[in-house]
């Protein structure tokens, strides 16, 4: 999609008009500052673009030249896209070396209403409830607290999500 057409459509008629207007203005600024043409600025139907699906306002705040060619090109340079995503995650609170999530097994009789990324408990509390790692390794107590995440529902795999997982959700709210 043409980024300007996508964002203008959403700014005119959509549930998030104010958001789309901000993104459209940021896209116009990006076009001017980066020396791009509208035909170069392709996006999803919602205006996200490049290898890592940045939004124009995120580009303005977090995009970097990861390959040293003097440009911030998230469409064609994986190095620029990944370095920019790393900057965005770092600025959003990513803790280097801390886990994002680990797979866990839940005990029989687990109260599934506790499985919600907003319901956090100290790792020691989850352990006391019988939550453990399937591989026999210890739960990462250094992570402090975690939440049980069931991306495929109660019959699918279970994960314990930590602060870095919530940081990823700031980047992209789709947890599936």
Spans of model-derived segments:
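Flexible, glycine-rich surface segments
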Residues: 38, 45-49, 55-156, 162-165
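Short, surface-exposed, charged loop/turn segments at secondary-structure junctions
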Residues: 3-7, 115-117
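Short secondary-structure junctions and interdomain/linker hinges
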Residues: 14-17, 34-38, 92-96, 133, ...
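Generic structural signal for hydrophobic core residues of well-folded globular domains
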Residues: 10-11, 31, 62, 89-92, ...
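Acidic, His- and aromatic-enriched active-site or binding-groove loops in soluble protein domains
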Residues: 5-31, 65-67
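Short, hydrophobic/amphipathic alpha-helical patches that form generic packing surfaces
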Residues: 8-10, 87, 166-170, 176
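Short, functionally critical alpha-helical segments immediately adjacent to catalytic or ligand/cofactor-binding
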Residues: 1, 27-32, 85-86
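Solvent-exposed, acidic/flexible segments
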Residues: 1, 13-24, 48, 52, ...
């Amino acid at each position: 999609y043409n980024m300007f057409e996508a964002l203008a459509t959403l700014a005119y008629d959509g549930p998030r008009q104010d958001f789309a207007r901000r993104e459209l203005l940021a896209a116009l600024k990006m076009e001017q500052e980066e020396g791009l043409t509208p035909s170069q600025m392709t996006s999803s139907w919602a205006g996200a673009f490049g290898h890592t699906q940045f939004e124009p306002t995120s580009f303005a705040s977090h995009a970097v030249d990861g390959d040293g060619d003097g440009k911030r090109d998230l469409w064609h340079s994986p190095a620029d896209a990944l370095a920019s995503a790393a900057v965005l995650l770092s600025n959003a609170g990513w803790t280097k070396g801390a886990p994002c999530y680990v797979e866990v097994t839940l005990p029989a009789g687990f109260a599934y209403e506790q499985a919600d990324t907003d319901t956090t408990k100290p790792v020691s509390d989850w352990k006391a409830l019988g939550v453990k790692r399937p591989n026999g390794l210890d739960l990462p107590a250094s992570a402090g607290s975690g939440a049980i995440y069931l991306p495929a529902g109660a019959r699918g795999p279970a994960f314990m999500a930590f602060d870095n997982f919530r940081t990823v959700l700031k980047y992209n709210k789709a947890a599936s």
